[in-house]
Amino acid sequence: MNDSAKTATIYHNPRCSTSRNTLKLIEDAGIEPTVVKYLETPPSHDGLRKLLDDAGLRPSEAIRKKEALFKELGLATASEDELLDAMVANPILIERPIVVTDRGTVLARPYEKVREIL
């Protein structure tokens, strides 16, 4: 029996090479994913919390610490809840891509990590 993923959703930033490479791997696996351009349609607070929980990640593990806004907002000493709030308010801070399939959820960094759930 084939236990490969049948469906996929990618939280995608087309300007990010890692996100583009991840999308290509999904498509090369024969899956036509749902593409969520999260900068245009960001997840809700509860939606982002669920994505991170499903991936086994804390907000501090899924926030873009090198993004200028991270420093501008003084987030280095923020709590996990404060980081999540900042990510919802400023989706550019969300590390990408996050991929959800019927086999699990991963932050696909490096992009090959998506193979774990395909």
Walk through the language-model features, giving the residues of each.
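Thiol/selenol-based redox catalytic cores and closely related redox-interacting motifs
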Residues: Y38-L118
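Intrinsic-disorder/low-complexity regions
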Residues: M1-N2, A89
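Local sequence-structure signature of Cys/Sec-based thiol-disulfide redox active-site neighborhoods
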Residues: N2-A29, P33-Y38
